[in-house]
From Swiss-Prot:
Its main location: nucleus. It comes from Mus musculus (Mouse). This is Storkhead-box protein 1. Pfam families: Stork_head. InterPro entries: Storkhead-box_winged-helix (IPR019391), STOX1/2 (IPR040126).
């Protein structure tokens, strides 16, 4: 047992009491009372001994109840005793001294200590101190801190340090992160590290205050420094620690010098670590802790193993550890790497940065980065370019360069729409369109206003003469004869793109034509079925997307044309005026369309009152130069043609023409049987002027070329021509035909009259296709070719087809209203001439061609082949007047027509002159859907000789072929949304 130790030897106790009772609540501390007592006695200048003794007093302690303990050397203590005896001792202000006496030394029995210090405790204290000083705690820095601040203990080895730290982590006393070691506090897992560090420092300060009572070597006993200054015989109560401040400071300086020497010896091994630790030391200089950055010789691999060993145990519930920083916390970045200044990033040369990048990641080279950057920039530019809508320009350019694909696509849609035929969708569209829009195909039904296609050029500027025509085109009746025949030779398709080889796609498209009749649309809103070619498609500028505005402008400036012989019924729709069915608008009636040959093959159709019709046809035929165009008359249509005045002066002149045409028909054998057009029955007109009106409407050119054409063909050739003509509606779906025969002068002044549903247009027998000039469009084929087989065709058709007798739109004339055109004289001035048939005996009804401009397309439908009889379906009473029946053509006859057309087109291009209208010719040929195959025996010498014989006819025909756009433009100027019979059907329909 250790000997007892005397505490506070030679001390003196002073018992003080306040002078007033109220001062007890606010009793000052012991040190304050001590200073007040010493100051009061030091001012006793008259008593020098007392003043000197008071100045040497030392504060020993303060006890509750006003006991002040002081300590002084023995002579000073004796002076205080003598002054108290003489009542010369002065108390502090506000108090009085009640008693003064000596205190015996306090005896204390010291407790023995162990000679070893727990390393875990020392490590926890060191980590807490470093955390309070905001110094990163690593194994290296921890060892340095132990050497500097705990010199009395032995420095542990790296293995011992590693294992001790692991044990502390398992005991949840410390934890490790990528930033070092930290002390675990009650709030460690709930708040961030910053408050924890403050709490740690507070706890450490509290522990430091309670250190003197613990008696451990880790606690500083600076509080004992004051009594030790008084005692010369001071000694250390424990040899394992330095309890005195002077000795501790000296030892720290000595250890720092030794640490520097050791650091110099190991500088080569720990360069990067020393660099980092020097920065740490400089950062913690304000903590008044002597930090020695000297590293200790230990292996880094074990440090890694230690860090990973306890990582997952301590952080399983806190956060994902950053283990990758553990091994490189004191080694990254290397010393040779330049440090980039945060303020100015341009101090490091680019080559140095490139070298650093290559050192970090050799794969991520500068070249790859450059290429990637360029690629991404290009991608962003392209994305921005597309987002601005410039892709439309690219598509437009592509459309200009590849019009062939556009034509093929349009033709494919047209053929597909034919297959759909009588779909409910088509009927629904027909009802929704109303009577003011005449749809031709599904693509045309949607357009209510004429639009310029994307690929078409800008409309050209009109000349003054064209502007005059355009202004007066609204009312063609006011045009004088000097304004006609002005611009009809100009090319309306100038500037449009050529159609490249679009003919080659026609074969596949044409094969899609069905063989079933299609009933579409009611009478009130007539329209062409999707499967049949629209009879007004050529002239409908609103429903024909391929025609640009340029064509319309030029055609509007062209001469107005007076139509000749379209069939136009007189119904309530027409009685309402041209608002429902405007003039110059070919209204649908494909199922009622048939060739004149077919109408002649039907017996019993004509009655006695209808005998004047063949006379009118024959008379009108004899006034035209059909092929060669040698009689180009410059006469304008008289003003009488634009009215329904039955007393016109031209009736007498036309009687001779009727006689001529009757004589010509008898020569051709067309009047052998009472050919009827029962499918073309019109409403009966009871006024006496109908005969004269019919004659005025049918100013049909003379047939001078018929005899010349008949002379060039033998019987065998006529047989072949008849077979080639047997396909009705070449280039069309049904037996659609129109009788629109006009003279050369009429090609300039006449308009193609519209026809209402249930009434169709006629072409003359013999398969003669009529072009836009009123001339038959069958190159190298005469009317006698088909007339030679007329009787045979008639007999075969009657034998094979029990349904051969056609039915009209109305079973009798009473089913349909019979309005008189004379009721609307103001509107009749805009009604084209026309003639109508009805099953009942009627006289041909003629309507006025007031809107006579640009619509003289002559659709031809030839006699059907004898091997494939005509199927003329009879309508049911419920269907009458509602849905026209579209006639399909048979595939064998279609192929015959296609191959023969191939030869005719070749000869036409070889003999025809190269003119400015060639783009137009290609445009016409592209929409015909012809195929260029030749496997039907048409390549025989007979056909070639037939073509060469009529090459001269081709020249005259080609000159008249290009007047179609001029007709169409005038029609477009009337703002009439109608569809033509063909979509630019070429004149050669075989």
């Amino acid at each position: 047992m250790a000997r007892p130790v005397q505490l506070a030897p030679g001390s003196l106790a002073l018992v003080l009491s306040p002078r007033e009772a109220g001062q007890a609540a606010g009793e000052p501390g012991g040190r304050a009372l001590f200073r007040a007592f010493r100051r009061a006695n030091a001012r006793c200048f008259w008593n020098a001994r007392l003043a000197r003794a008071a100045s040497r007093l030392a504060f020993l302690g303060w006890l509750r109840r006003g006991v002040l303990l002081v300590r002084a050397p023995q002579p000073c203590v004796q002076v205080l005793r003598d002054a108290w005896r003489r009542r010369a001792l002065r108390p502090p202000r506000g108090f009085r001294i009640t008693a003064v006496g000596d205190v015996f030394p306090v005896q204390m029995s010291p407790i023995a200590q162990c000679r070893f210090v727990p390393l875990a405790e020392v490590l926890c204290c060191a980590i807490a101190d470093m955390n309070a000083a905001q110094v990163m705690v690593t194994q290296q820095s921890l060892l340095e801190h132990l050497i500097k601040h705990y010199p009395g203990i032995a420095v542990p080895s790296p293995d011992i340090l590693y294992s001790t730290l692991g044990a502390l982590i398992q005991e949840r006393k410390i934890y490790h992160t990528g930033e070092g070691y930290f002390i675990v506090t009650p709030s460690t897992y709930f708040i961030t590290n910053t408050p924890m560090q403050g709490n740690k420092s507070a706890l450490l300060s509290n522990e430091g205050c309670s250190g003197p009572t613990s008696g451990t070597y880790l606690v500083s006993v600076d509080c004992c420094a004051e009594p030790t200054q008084e005692n010369e015989a001071l000694f250390s109560h424990c040899p394992s620690c330095q309890c005195y401040p002077d000795t501790s400071m000296c030892d720290s300086k000595d250890l720092l010098t030794a640490a520097e020497v050791t650091r110099k010896s190991q500088e080569g091994l720990e360069e990067t670590t020393a660099l980092t630790e020097n920065q740490v030391v400089s950062a913690s200089e304000d903590t008044h802790i002597c930090v020695n950055p000297k590293p200790l010789p230990y292996t880094k691999d074990k440090g890694k193993r230690f860090g990973f060993g306890f990582l997952w145990r301590s952080l399983s519930r806190k956060e994902k550890p950053k283990a990758e920083y553990h091994s490189f916390s004191a080694q990254f970045p290397p010393e040779e790497w330049p440090v980039r200044d945060e303020d100015s990033s341009t101090k490091i040369p680019r080559d140095v940065e490139h070298a650093l990048i290559k050192r970090i990641n050799p794969v991520l080279t500068v070249d790859n980065l450059t290429k990637h950057t360029a690629l991404m920039q290009k991608y962003e530019e392209q994305k921005k370019y597309n987002s601005q809508g410039t892709s439309m320009d690219i598509l437009t350019t592509r459309h200009k360069d590849s019009s062939k694909e556009v034509i093929g696509k349009r033709q494919g849609q047209f053929a597909k729409s034919r297959r759909r035929g009588s779909s409910h969708k088509g009927r629904h569209k027909a009802r929704s369109q109303g009577s003011e829009l005449e749809p031709g195909n599904p693509g045309q039904e949607k357009e209510k206003q004429p639009k310029v296609p994307a690929a078409q050029p800008a409309p050209r500027t009109k000349s003054p003469s064209e502007q005059v025509h355009h202004l007066q085109g609204r009312n063609p009746a006011v045009l004088g004869s000097h304004l006609i025949y002005k611009k009809q030779i100009n090319n309306p398709f100038q500037g449009m793109h050529l159609r490249k080889h679009s003919v080659s796609k026609g074969h596949a498209v044409q094969k899609t034509h069905g063989l079933k009749p299609t009933c579409v649309g009611p009478e009130e809103k007539p329209f062409w079925s999707a499967g049949s070619s629209d009879p007004s498609g050529v002239f409908d500028g609103e429903a024909q997307p391929p025609y640009p505005e340029q064509c319309r402008d030029k055609l509007e400036a062209g001469s107005t044309q007076v139509a000749k012989a379209p069939v136009h019924p007189v119904s309530d729709d027409f009685r309402g005026g041209p608002g429902n069915y405007p003039p110059r608008r070919v209204l649908p009636g494909p199922s009622r369309c048939c060739s004149f040959r077919e109408s002649m093959l039907r017996p019993g159709v004509y009655h006695e009152e209808n005998k004047d019709l063949p006379e009118v046809l024959r008379k009108s035929w004899s006034t035209c130069d059909m092929f060669l165009g040698t009689k180009e008359k410059k006469q304008a249509l008289p003003a009488q043609r634009c009215s329904l005045d039955p007393d016109s002066s031209s009736v007498h002149a036309e009687d001779k023409t009727v006689d001529k045409i009757l004589h010509q028909f008898q020569n051709l054998g067309l009047l052998d049987c009472p050919a009827g057009a029962n499918r073309l029955r019109t409403h009966e007109r009871q006024d006496g002027n109908s005969e004269e009106l019919s004659r005025k409407a049918l100013q049909i050119p003379e047939a001078e070329i018929v005899n010349m054409e008949n002379e060039g063909l033998s019987d065998s050739e006529q047989d072949q021509v008849a077979l080639s003509h047997s396909d009705p509606g070449a280039g069309d779906d049904g037996g659609c035909s129109s009788l629109c025969l006009e003279d050369d002068d009429f090609s300039e002044t006449d308009d193609f009259c519209p026809s209402l549903p249930g009434h169709t247009q006629h072409s003359f027998a013999g398969g003669g296709t009529w072009n836009h000039l009123g001339t038959p469009a069958m190159t190298g084929k005469s009317l006698t070719d088909c007339n030679s087989k007329a009787h045979r065709l008639e007999l075969l058709a009657i034998e094979r087809n029990p349904w051969y007798k056609a039915t009209g739109l109305f079973s009798n004339a009473g089913e349909s209203p019979n309005p008189d055109l004379s009721d609307n004289p103001g509107q009749n001035s805009r009604i084209p001439w026309g003639f109508n048939y009805e099953g009942e005996p009627t006289v041909a009804h003629v309507q006025t061609p007031a809107a006579a401009a640009g619509r003289s397309l002559l659709a031809c439908s030839t006699v059907r082949t004898t091997s494939f009889p005509v199927e003329i379906l009879q309508e049911s009473p419920g269907d009458r007047g509602k849905s026209p029946i579209v006639w399909r053509q048979s595939l064998p006859s279609q192929e015959m027509k296609e191959h023969f057309t191939d030869k005719l087109q070749l000869v036409k291009t070889s003999h025809g002159p190269v003119s400015a209208q060639e783009p137009q010719g290609e445009h016409l040929e592209g929409t015909e859907n012809y195929s260029m195959t030749g496997d039907s025996g048409i390549d025989s010498p007979r056909t070639q000789s037939l073509v060469s014989t009529n090459s001269a006819i081709l020249d005259g025909f080609k000159r008249r072929q290009h007047f179609l756009p001029n007709r169409e433009g005038v029609q477009k100027s009337q703002n009439l949304a109608s569809n033509s019979l063909f979509q630019l059907t070429p004149a050669i329909n075989v």
